[in-house]
């Protein structure tokens, strides 16, 4: 009986430690996948890269990271659903960003940028986030 009572705190500690590790590991994998896709897309010479997209990064400074990811996913979704361009890569980015955001949002279309500039800025943000992960 004494052995069981001594094991309980150890098991709880292991459970907490592994859940933190798994959470951080998922963050790494998702960000790596996003960055890899962004590297692939931004290296392409494709006319789709000149399409205009809502500039969600021109949002106010008090916008949360989750809101930014949600708006970026929404803007990408608009591109690949309305244009037959880079659908496989953009839908994958949409899925990964939506997973990081875990919310729904709307996008203000008043400011625009090219898809290339949008993806370059998103890549910079993701690399900064990855360096902190």
Curated annotation (Swiss-Prot):
<feature type="glycosylation site" description="N-linked (GlcNAc...) asparagine">
    <location>
        <position position="96"/>
    </location>
</feature>
<dbReference type="GO" id="GO:0042113">
    <property type="term" value="P:B cell activation"/>
</dbReference>
<dbReference type="GO" id="GO:0016239">
    <property type="term" value="P:positive regulation of macroautophagy"/>
</dbReference>
<keyword id="KW-1015">Disulfide bond</keyword>
<dbReference type="InterPro" id="IPR001325">
    <property type="entry name" value="IL-4/IL-13"/>
</dbReference>
<dbReference type="InterPro" id="IPR018096">
    <property type="entry name" value="IL-4/IL-13_CS"/>
</dbReference>
<keyword id="KW-0202">Cytokine</keyword>
<keyword id="KW-0075">B-cell activation</keyword>
<feature type="disulfide bond">
    <location>
        <begin position="70"/>
        <end position="105"/>
    </location>
</feature>
<dbReference type="GO" id="GO:0045893">
    <property type="term" value="P:positive regulation of DNA-templated transcription"/>
</dbReference>
<feature type="disulfide bond">
    <location>
        <begin position="27"/>
        <end position="133"/>
    </location>
</feature>
<keyword id="KW-0325">Glycoprotein</keyword>
<dbReference type="Pfam" id="PF00727">
    <property type="entry name" value="IL4"/>
</dbReference>
<dbReference type="GO" id="GO:0005125">
    <property type="term" value="F:cytokine activity"/>
</dbReference>
<feature type="disulfide bond">
    <location>
        <begin position="48"/>
        <end position="85"/>
    </location>
</feature>
<feature type="glycosylation site" description="N-linked (GlcNAc...) asparagine">
    <location>
        <position position="102"/>
    </location>
</feature>
<feature type="glycosylation site" description="N-linked (GlcNAc...) asparagine">
    <location>
        <position position="62"/>
    </location>
</feature>
<comment type="function">
    <text>Participates in at least several B-cell activation processes as well as of other cell types. It is a costimulator of DNA-synthesis. It induces the expression of class II MHC molecules on resting B-cells. It enhances both secretion and cell surface expression of IgE and IgG1. It also regulates the expression of the low affinity Fc receptor for IgE (CD23) on both lymphocytes and monocytes. Positively regulates IL31RA expression in macrophages. Stimulates autophagy in dendritic cells by interfering with mTORC1 signaling and through the induction of RUFY4.</text>
</comment>
<dbReference type="InterPro" id="IPR009079">
    <property type="entry name" value="4_helix_cytokine-like_core"/>
</dbReference>
<keyword id="KW-0339">Growth factor</keyword>
<dbReference type="GO" id="GO:0005615">
    <property type="term" value="C:extracellular space"/>
</dbReference>
<dbReference type="GO" id="GO:0050728">
    <property type="term" value="P:negative regulation of inflammatory response"/>
</dbReference>
<comment type="similarity">
    <text>Belongs to the IL-4/IL-13 family.</text>
</comment>
<protein>
    <recommendedName>
        <fullName>Interleukin-4</fullName>
    </recommendedName>
</protein>
<keyword id="KW-0964">Secreted</keyword>
<dbReference type="GO" id="GO:0050776">
    <property type="term" value="P:regulation of immune response"/>
</dbReference>
<dbReference type="GO" id="GO:0005136">
    <property type="term" value="F:interleukin-4 receptor binding"/>
</dbReference>
<dbReference type="GO" id="GO:0006955">
    <property type="term" value="P:immune response"/>
</dbReference>
<keyword id="KW-0732">Signal</keyword>
<feature type="glycosylation site" description="N-linked (GlcNAc...) asparagine">
    <location>
        <position position="108"/>
    </location>
</feature>
<dbReference type="GO" id="GO:0035771">
    <property type="term" value="P:interleukin-4-mediated signaling pathway"/>
</dbReference>
<dbReference type="InterPro" id="IPR002354">
    <property type="entry name" value="IL-4"/>
</dbReference>
<feature type="signal peptide">
    <location>
        <begin position="1"/>
        <end position="24"/>
    </location>
</feature>
<dbReference type="GO" id="GO:0008083">
    <property type="term" value="F:growth factor activity"/>
</dbReference>
């Amino acid at each position: 009986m004494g052995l069981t009572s001594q094991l309980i705190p150890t098991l709880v500690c292991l459970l907490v430690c592994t859940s933190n590790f798994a959470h951080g590991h998922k963050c790494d994998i998702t960000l790596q996948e996003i960055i890899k896709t962004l590297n692939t897309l931004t290296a392409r010479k494709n006319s789709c890269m000149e399409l205009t997209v809502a500039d969600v990064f021109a949002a106010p400074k008090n916008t949360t990271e989750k809101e930014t990811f949600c708006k970026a996913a929404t803007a990408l979704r608009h591109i690949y659903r309305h244009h037959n361009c880079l659908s496989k890569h953009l839908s994958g980015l949409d899925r990964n960003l939506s997973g990081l955001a875990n919310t729904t949002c709307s996008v203000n279309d008043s400011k625009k940028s090219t898809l290339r500039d949008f993806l370059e800025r998103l890549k910079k943000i993701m690399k900064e986030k990855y360096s902190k992960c």
